[in-house]
Amino acid sequence: QEKREVSTFEEKIALLKEFQKEYNFEQIYTTERNVLGNNVQELRCAVITDTEHFTAGPVKVNVLDRIGTGDSFVAGVLYGINNQYTPQDTINFALSSFALKHTIIGDFQIASKNDVEQFDINNEKVVIKR
């Protein structure tokens, strides 16, 4: 197959919808990261189902460490699926976990479930109490 370039998040979602239909996946999850400079990044994510798609973000974060952020995203997805969250709630929880991990030094997520749930992905000024 020929390689297709995508330049926007919306184009990526459209391509993943085609992929989902072709290979009959129940759900596909994806993330996007835009580097804004000075250790500031904009994050968002999406889930594509067989009938629709859901997005979360963008959220801006000050990055302390990127190691383990993808693992944290997947952990958030699995937590949402295992607890029978809706696709939108799952992707919101996963984005919160993904974004929070960017603020934690080290290769694993130490934020609690409560920290993840309290993270407001719609608010640009987030205070994390530890």
Question: What positions do the PLM features span?
Answer:
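Conserved phosphate/ATP/ADP-binding segment of small-molecule kinases
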Residues: 1-50
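Generic hydrophobic, helix-prone segments enriched in Leu/Val/Ile
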Residues: 16-19, 116, 126
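Short charge-dense sequence patches
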Residues: 27-29, 47, 67-71, 130
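Conserved post-catalytic alpha-helical subdomain immediately downstream of the catalytic base
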Residues: 57-121
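Glycine/Thr-rich phosphate-binding loops that ligate phosphate moieties of nucleotide
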Residues: 118-130
